[in-house]
Amino acid sequence: MDEALIQEQERQLQKTGRYYRHVFWLCVPLLCMACYFYGARPLLLCGIALLTGNLCDRLVALLRHRVYTNKDLSNESFSLIIALLMPATVDIYVLVVAVLAGVLIGKEVFGGYGSYPFNPAAVGYAVAAVSWPEQVVRYPQPYTPLPLWDASAVPVSSTIEDTLRSGGILNLNALAVVLGEFAAPMGTGAALVILACGLVLWTQKDVHIGASASFLITCGLIAFFFPRQVGLADSTLFSSLMPRLQGVRDELHTGAMLFCAVFLLNEPYTCAHHRLGRILYGALVGIATMGFRYFGVYETGVCFALLAVNSVSALIDRTEERLYRLLHRLPSERKEAAE
């Protein structure tokens, strides 16, 4: 492996390695919630995902003739995120393929640490969702007893997405929504825990709030002004205020929206790097996400939206840099001309 690239990756690891360490450990509370809802199977799935991601890291180190270091937890954090985006009933081979796709195709193919243009966790999830939709986008109800190894006989459904897509309103009380007591990916329903994790990442200066806030605000505004619920779009704004707000609640708390806003959107190497760029980046992901949710076939369309906007995040950065230089060059040129 090129020595200059190795040194650059070591510098990047010193710069952003703490982000992945924090994400790794903050996935643990969500895993605990998943175990509370579904028993020991989420622990088994996350353990297998971690082992797969770590073995990929060691294999790539061997192939590239470099020393493996346990300071880099990016593979492990991507693996945990992929596992938490899965239903607790997913077959083990599907999860393993998703982790392999995310780590090897989403990350290592592009050069490894810090060189990838697409979020590796979103890549892994997208590959699994497209290849095995019946496994990835159908979920068991919380508190359903799950066998440890083979959960193929457990009843699963896509009730949440079916209800929203047909123009209905979720029959869930507020406490059930914020605690995640509904059929969803095993680590994405507990809104209170996810928000607490986001607060920790923000206080540790691992993430910037601009991208996440603009993403959630954009999704909320679209859900409020263009609701999917039957009859709301044709009614006046004030006469349907409460149903519209409930629709916003339902949209933001399902489909792994909050989870992705905290754990995927601010990934250091795929998010825009400047303040205005991050706001635009989050808004674009929000627009694309609602487009996928309204017109697509996957409840977790946010992962596909993220991949789509990842393709232009570098362009957003370059455009902002050019505008910044242009706006600061014009006053200096005028000043020089006046002198």
For each feature predicted by the language model, list its residue ranges.
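Cytosolic-side transmembrane-helix boundaries in multi-pass membrane proteins
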Residues: M1-H22, F292-E339
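Hydrophobic, membrane-inserted alpha-helices
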Residues: L26-M33, G53, D57, N75-L84, ...
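Long hydrophobic alpha-helical segments that form multi-pass transmembrane helix bundles
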Residues: S115-L195
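Loop-to-transmembrane alpha-helix initiation sites
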Residues: P117-A121, R249-M257, R278, G296-V309
